Amino acid sequence: MTSNEKLALITEAADELKAERIETLDIRAKSSVADYFVVCSGTSDRHVQSIAERVAEKMTVQKSRPFRVEGERSGWVLQDYGDVVLHVMRDEQREFYDLEALWESMQPDPNLA
């Protein structure tokens, strides 16, 4: 799957379970870690877990499994699909860590151009 196909499938799956504030961050010019981050919120720990599970199910059907999964019971689940990384967070964690502002304020890396 291409990055854009993964991105579309991940955001669609998150939206199906009513994830809130789904944001896509294009980090290609800022990091070699991934091309995109998808950040979304769940209303409870169970909602966060359900969103992450739905994404994993949809991606598995397409033969794409995460390289790594972190925080399955912590209110912040991270699924690393290589070029696309999903962050599903409770609002409290999202406000505290503010990944969107962190990555948007970061300057492009000239070595990645």
Regions found by a protein language model. Give the residues of each.
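Polybasic/polar functional segments that serve as interface/processing modules
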Residues: 1-33, 43-79, 84, 91-95, ...
